[in-house]
């Protein structure tokens, strides 16, 4: 049976760069890897062909020989100065995976494993709701969640009795087995110890040898002053318990601050909209304003204040997290136009508008309409 062209196998042109070869092989190897296709002989054979093609094309000398002589360059006794077949593909393909995939396939020691074989517990996430006042003052929030916790009967070892575990005779403690198939090696997770490298002789009846059981956890979370929505609180070791005494994961608590009826927040600064009467905006005066700390502050409104003007109260905002500083509070003025006026009130306003100095009293609107009039005259005269 003739062998497939290496370039065609990987879907490459003969001018492919090493980066393109690696990318193509990675894509195809992920699809046909034996760990992803257990028991599929066709996938296993395809994987062998892909690995052979990669081994040749990624090597400068082997690729040059292949480009010149084709598959015959690697035949026994080719007589063309080519490579011996058996020595030409001596690569351990687990090295290829470590290079291309970062050791992510099962069969190597995964990053989720600790050195002595136990699987580290997963990190957990929990969302809580707090008020803006809780964020200002700091608070403690009771939480509860269900996860794997360390088994109390065996203290997490998974074993009953003095002998905790013995080395797996199949993988000899490595957690994986290697099978030589022709010119390369396939590495798989040991099916006897499931990659742990150890076997428990007398399993704990409560946890069935896992060293952990499902249970409810109740904690009191300390929420620091100044925390914002999107921040996270990390509780070390409060996540899922590790397998057979391995390290537990962490718990991440994400606070969500409820919408406040008065304030909006931007970082450590607080903002609020305050409607004031037209007469107050015109003549100036004072208003009493509540702060997030529960105190009241007398705030001066300048004479001639306009709609949208902002008044700043220094250090009346939120605490800066892990600091003694505070943000500011900004009051945005909304000048309220009077409604439901009496006839007498309307006459007074008309009389005021007819006063000769109203141009100076309303410089923005007067100036605007003068510009409009000038613009219109320019159009008519053009």
From Swiss-Prot:
The J domain is necessary and sufficient to stimulate DnaK ATPase activity. Zinc center 1 plays an important role in the autonomous, DnaK-independent chaperone activity of DnaJ. Zinc center 2 is essential for interaction with DnaK and for DnaJ activity. This is Chaperone protein DnaJ. GO terms for molecular function: ATP binding; heat shock protein binding; unfolded protein binding; zinc ion binding. It comes from Ehrlichia ruminantium (strain Gardel). CXXCXGXG motif repeats lie at residues 151-158, 168-175, 190-197, 204-211. The lineage of its organism: Bacteria, Pseudomonadati, Pseudomonadota, Alphaproteobacteria, Rickettsiales. Belongs to the DnaJ family. Zn(2+) 2 binds at residues 168, 171, 190, 193. Its cofactor is Zn(2+). Homodimer. A zinc finger (CR-type) spans 138-216. Zn(2+) 1 binds at residues 151, 154, 204, 207. GO terms for biological process: chaperone cofactor-dependent protein refolding; DNA replication; protein refolding; response to heat. GO terms for cellular component: cytoplasm. It comes from the Bacteria. Participates actively in the response to hyperosmotic and heat shock by preventing the aggregation of stress-denatured proteins and by disaggregating proteins, also in an autonomous, DnaK-independent fashion. Unfolded proteins bind initially to DnaJ; upon interaction with the DnaJ-bound protein, DnaK hydrolyzes its bound ATP, resulting in the formation of a stable complex. GrpE releases ADP from DnaK; ATP binding to DnaK triggers the release of the substrate protein, thus completing the reaction cycle. Keywords: Chaperone, Cytoplasm, DNA replication, Metal-binding, Repeat, Stress response, Zinc, Zinc-finger. The keyword Iron-sulfur does not apply. It is found in: Cytoplasm. Its main location: cytoplasm. Binds 2 Zn(2+) ions per monomer. Pfam families: DnaJ (PF00226), DnaJ_C (PF01556), DnaJ_CXXCXGXG (PF00684).
């Amino acid at each position: 049976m003739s062998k497939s062209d290496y370039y065609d196998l990987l879907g490459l042109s003969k001018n492919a760069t090493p980066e393109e070869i690696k990318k193509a092989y990675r894509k195809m190897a992920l699809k046909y890897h034996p760990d992803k296709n257990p028991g599929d002989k066709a996938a296993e054979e395809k994987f062998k062909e892909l690995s052979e093609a990669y081994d040749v094309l990624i090597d400068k000398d082997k690729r040059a020989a292949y480009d010149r002589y084709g598959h015959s360059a690697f035949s026994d006794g080719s007589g063309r100065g080519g490579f011996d077949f058996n020595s030409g593909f001596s690569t351990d393909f687990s090295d290829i995976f470590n290079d291309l995939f970062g050791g992510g396939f099962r069969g190597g020691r995964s990053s989720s494993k600790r050195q002595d074989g136990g699987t580290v517990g997963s990190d957990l996430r929990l969302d809580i709701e707090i008020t803006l006042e809780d964020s200002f003052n700091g608070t403690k929030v009771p939480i509860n969640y269900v996860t794997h916790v360390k088994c109390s009967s065996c203290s997490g070892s998974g074993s009953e009795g003095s002998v905790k575990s013995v080395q797996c005779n199949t993988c000899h403690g490595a957690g994986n087995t290697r099978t030589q198939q022709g010119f390369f090696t396939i590495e798989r997770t040991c099916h006897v110890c499931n990659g742990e490298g150890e076997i428990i002789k007398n399993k704990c009846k409560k946890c069935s040898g896992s060293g952990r059981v499902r249970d409810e956890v109740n904690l009191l979370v300390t929420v620091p002053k100044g925390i914002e929505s999107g921040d996270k609180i990390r509780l070390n070791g409060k996540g899922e318990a590790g397998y057979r005494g391995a390290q537990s994961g962490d718990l991440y608590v994400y606070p969500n601050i409820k919408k406040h009826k008065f304030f909006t927040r931007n970082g450590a600064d607080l903002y609020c909209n305050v409607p004031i009467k037209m007469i107050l905006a015109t003549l100036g005066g004072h208003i009493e304003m509540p702060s997030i700390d529960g105190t009241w502050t007398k705030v001066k409104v300048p004479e001639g204040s306009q709609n949208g003007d902002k008044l700043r109260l220094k250090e009346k905002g939120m605490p800066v997290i892990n600091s003694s500083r505070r943000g500011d509070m900004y009051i945005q003025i909304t000048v309220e136009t009077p409604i439901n006026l009496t006839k007498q009130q309307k006459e007074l306003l008309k009389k005021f508008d007819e006063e000769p100095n109203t141009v100076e009293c309303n410089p923005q609107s007067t100036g605007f309409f003068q510009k409009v009039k000038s613009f219109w005259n320019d159009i008519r005269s053009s």
